[in-house]
């Protein structure tokens, strides 16, 4: 299963979670993991075929499923959708992108694309969902922003990506302070490179496993399940005293 060892300890029954970027990779795996833990799922993505495919999986888990076919950069459409939600406890702010380029050759269009998706849209969706949680739920909620180890350290050919993810880290801490009085916890997860269809394509002409393992003390790569399990923990009441922090999922990469 997507979850792993601690599924039995993470109970999300009765909670509703909105997951952006839910059609593939970490977002898809997280939506399934949260559903396995009992959460009802609202999936946001741009590929209707994949949203329908996810629905078939989620429905088998006996929880509710709704989806919005929407680009997170479309603020007005996201606002329209989120304002219609009748129950919301958890946001997984996952949508993201990267265009690896050396600093001296970074295109202006790349900067705009990366910052719009990775930072501006994360801010906008978080603000919309936080207001909706406050409106609907006196008990508060949990917001998990998907960051990266490159929001903690730099990476070659990832200058703009790092800039965007460092922004997410600052956003997470600021939100945690401002939303604490509403009992809304805000945290981030910072995974190392996860092997997804997108990263497989990027590393097609490189020895991915060798590269990652040689730089990871635990000598293994991060999986979608590793990330989804941590997100489920932060979404659950088991993490009720955790806010304003980051869970680094990197096998020791950043400890060097």
Language model: regions and residue ranges:
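Short C-terminal tail/terminal secondary-structure segment
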Residues: 4-9, 153, 232, 243-256
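Conserved glycine-rich cofactor-binding loop
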Residues: 16, 23-25
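Conserved glycine-rich Rossmann-like NAD(P)H-binding loop of the short-chain dehydrogenase/reductase
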Residues: 39-53
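Substrate-binding pocket helix/loop in short-chain dehydrogenase/reductase
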Residues: 102-103, 107-115, 212
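Active-site helix of classical SDR
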Residues: 126, 164, 172
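Residue(s) in the substrate-gating loop at a strand-loop-helix junction
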Residues: 148
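Short, small/polar-rich loop/turn modules that mediate ligand/substrate recognition or access, typified
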Residues: 180-185, 242-244
């Amino acid at each position: 299963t997507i979850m792993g060892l601690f599924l039995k300890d993470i109970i999300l029954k009765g909670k509703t979670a909105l997951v952006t970027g839910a059609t593939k990779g970490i977002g898809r795996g997280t939506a399934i993991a949260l559903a396995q833990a009992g959460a009802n799922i609202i999936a946001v993505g741009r590929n209707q075929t994949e949203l329908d495919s996810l629905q078939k999986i989620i429905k088998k888990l006996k929880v509710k499923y709704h989806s919005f076919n929407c680009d997170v950069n479309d603020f007005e459409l996201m606002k329209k959708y989120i304002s219609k939600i009748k129950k919301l406890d958890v946001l997984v702010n996952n949508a993201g992108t990267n265009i690896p380029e050396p600093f001296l050759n970074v295109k202006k269009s790349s900067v705009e694309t990366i910052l719009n998706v990775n930072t501006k849209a994360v801010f906008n969706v978080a603000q919309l969902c936080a207001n909706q949680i406050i409106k609907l739920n006196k008990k508060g909620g949990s917001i998990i922003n998907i960051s990266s180890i490159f929001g903690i350290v730099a990476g070659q050919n990832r200058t703009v990506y790092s800039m965007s993810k460092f922004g997410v880290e600052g956003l997470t801490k600021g939100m945690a302070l401002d939303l604490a009085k509403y009992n809304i916890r805000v945290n981030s997860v910072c995974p190392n490179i996860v092997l997804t269809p997108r990263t497989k394509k990027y590393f097609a002409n490189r020895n991915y496993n060798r590269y990652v393992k040689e730089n990871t003390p635990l000598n293994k790569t991060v999986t979608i399940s590793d990330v989804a399990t941590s997100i489920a923990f932060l979404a659950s009441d088991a993490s009720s005293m955790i806010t304003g922090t980051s869970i680094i999922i990197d096998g020791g990469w950043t400890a060097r």
